[in-house]
Structures are given as structure tokens and as C-alpha cells.
């Protein structure tokens, strides 16, 4: 079997394994049997190894890191998602992570293996602009950051689904253990009630007498079952942590790209569509992390912001290339 035939076998195998993985996780959500969850996790590991073997075979065939066209980048993205999946699953110990990540990985592999024309699946010599060591350093880091941010955003979307898009009061902290919530800390005073429930607050003057009564208002939170509340709390926390992992990767990838651009084109930043949307992506997730860390946001509001980030990542990765304009248009995906 030559390498081309092996690659064809491996991409079809990856599709079939991910299809089984998705169904296994979905069944495990309904019937939470330990052996079923372990089987689904094992199938995801097989899918990741299959994609790894595919990328390795392509590397041997082409002689360069396999991330030079849409087909290769899609499989690299799927590899990144399946790899980040295990980080999220280990952190959460929840079968719901796989129920969210397996469909997107399956969709990406299906698009690459079954939808792309044959000529777009074949390897080709690198264009001169890509013959650089920066290809691996910049593009691979960007793709891993996309995969990580997608997984974090998907978990945020799952949170919105579990909570039906309503405001819920979570028990965890937006910044992990030792964090604070919005409304609990103001200056040096602790307010155990905060703005969780309507209450009457006394405002004292200098004489010590109560001067006025003010009624504080808040949006009432819906009540979830203990199981759904625990799941929502887990999804919110893990989504935040995964996005916190992907954001520095995105930052490093953008900086590496700027250095490469200066070497190749004599300018660190050219404001072409890909660079502009990479900056927009960075700003969206910077706003997300800023809101969670400094404002104490939890639950619905940051989840909506992360969900919008999922769309922005796809536009940055794939959407702007449909324009066929800019310095990145030669790779159709870069």
C-alpha cells in the first residue's frame, strides 16, 4: 500500500471512528454507564491516533509539515479538537464534553474527506512564500489556538443549552478557587447578598442615623434541578479554563505571524482580511477573559460572548478566504 492509498484509508477510518464516537457519547448521556463512557473516550483516542497517522503519512509523502492546504488544515484542526477534548474531559470528568466535541470533529473530517474535490485533497509543492520554518511555528500554533477556542466556545454554547439561555446562579467562581463574584466585593466591604435578590439597604449618615432606604433590584435567576445546576457549573468553569488556554496560543500565533510577515513582505501588519479578523478574534476573547477576571462575570453573559467567538473563529479561519483577497489568499485557508 502506497502513502496515497494509506492516507485515503486513514481519512475514511477517522470519519467512521468519529461517527461511532459521537453516537457512543450521545448514548452515554442518556445511559451513563461507566463502560459506555470509557468506550466512547477510547474511540475518541483511536480517532486522534488515526488522524495523527494520516498527518504523519502526508508529511512523509510531501516532505513538509502537512498544513499547506485546506484538506491538511481541516484534519489538523480536527486533530487539535480531539486532543483538547481530552484536556477538557479530564478537567471536568463529564461525558457531556464528548457529546459536544465529537460532532464538530466529525463534521470537519466529513467535509475534508467526503466533500472536498480530489484535486484539493492532493499534496502539492509549497509556494515560495510558505517555504519557511515559520510555517510550522505560526500556522500550527494558530490552528491549535482555533481548536482550543472552538472547544471552549462549544462548552459555552452547551451551557446556554443546559440553562435554556436563562440567568442562573452558579456556585463556582469565575476565576477558580479563591476568586470573587461581581457584587460580592466593593471596596473593602463584603456584601453577602450582593445583587442576587431584591433587598432593602440602609444608608447611614455621619451621625450614625439611618437617612434613607433604597431598594436594590436584580434579575431573578431560574431554578434548575441539582443535576442540571452541577452540569451548568461544570460547563461554565471548564469553558472558561479552555478559553484561557487558547487565548495565549492565539496571541503567540499572531506575534509569530507578524514576525514572519516582516521577513517575507517587509511589514509586520498589512490589515488584510485574515489579519483583521485575527485581531477581531483576539479582541473578542480578550473581552471575554477581561469580563470574567476583572468584572466577575459568570453564566449567561460570558457564555453569549464565547458563543459569538465561535462564529468569529470560523470567519477568521475559513470565511475570509472565500473573498480570495489579501496576502493570505494563496493558501485558501492561511
UniProtKB/Swiss-Prot annotation:
Family: Belongs to the CcmF/CycK/Ccl1/NrfE/CcsA family.
Membrane topology field: Multi-pass membrane protein
Recorded phenotype for the gene knockout or disruption: Cannot be insertionally inactivated suggesting it has an essential function.
Keywords: Cytochrome c-type biogenesis, Membrane, Thylakoid, Transmembrane, Transmembrane helix
Cellular component aspect of the GO annotation: plasma membrane-derived thylakoid membrane
Name of the molecule in the record: Cytochrome c biogenesis protein CcsA
Subunit text: May interact with ccs1.
Source species of the chain: Synechocystis sp. (strain ATCC 27184 / PCC 6803 / Kazusa)
Compartment annotation: Cellular thylakoid membrane
GO BP of this protein: cytochrome complex assembly
Segments crossing the lipid bilayer: 12-32, 35-55, 67-87, 96-116, 141-161, 242-262, 277-297, 303-323
Molecular-function GO terms, alphabetical: heme binding
Taxonomy, superkingdom: Bacteria
Function text: Required during biogenesis of c-type cytochromes (cytochrome c6 and cytochrome f) at the step of heme attachment.
Induction: By light.
InterPro entries registered for this protein in UniProt: Cyt_c_assembly (IPR002541), Cyt_c_biogenesis_CcsA (IPR017562), Cyt_c_biogenesis_CcsA/CcmC (IPR045062)
